[in-house]
Amino acid sequence: MKSKKKIFSVFAGLLVWGIASSCGAAAYYATIEQPSSASELIKSGTEFNVKPIDFAAISPKDLGYNSAEEWKTDSKPVPQAFADAFPVLLKEANIDNKKVKIISPDERVSKGIVVDVAVKSIILKWNAFAAQPDEFLCNVTFADAATSQKLFSAIINVNSRSGNPYAQAWGMSFSNRLQQAAYNIAWVLTKIIAQGKIDPAVY
């Protein structure tokens, strides 16, 4: 999707940030469904095998693409952005006793916990003036690698809001918003890895 680039002044960008922040724009996700209690096996787990984000349910035409090739071009940087997020997030959270490894979609592992994220729909809501992000409805699953026992399953609405409020107001391309959403999804997974669940409220 070829987004129209809008040029804003620094003042305008910061003004949008201020207005959006006052309206609660710091939310990066909302939980739709999850278990009532935390998974102790996830909390005590030390090895997490994370599969790339699954976009198989997404139709490029529904997002305004004229061809699958355009979608592939825009989404190509997403796997790397997703993988690169975990070392940063683990360090920020001071988590040094857990290892996160990115595995291929069909890779079979016998140790640790396998993490799957499938994006079921993308709701295009991005508005530069209001700093409103797109939304990614995700099915998140954690399973024991050895037994395939499901340890955690949730439906979480993760958005493409940037941690840099000025970048949010500046006018990101859809490819950049996809990468930002991937980072936010990794952030949600990091919280589950640490807590065995995710905070239920909009965060």
Provide a role label for each language-model segment:
Residues 2-11:
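Bacterial N-terminal signal peptides that target proteins for export
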Residues 23-84, 194-203:
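A structural "domain/chain start" motif
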Residues 24-43, 95-97, 150-203:
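C-terminal/domain-edge helix-coil "capping" segments
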Residues 25-29, 101-151, 161-164, 168, ...:
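Surface-exposed short loop/turn segments
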Residues 52-58, 118-124, 157-158:
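Generic short beta-strand segments
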Residues 67-77, 127-128, 168-176:
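Second-shell loop/turn segments in exported
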Residues 76-105:
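Mid-chain, structured segments of secreted extracytoplasmic proteins
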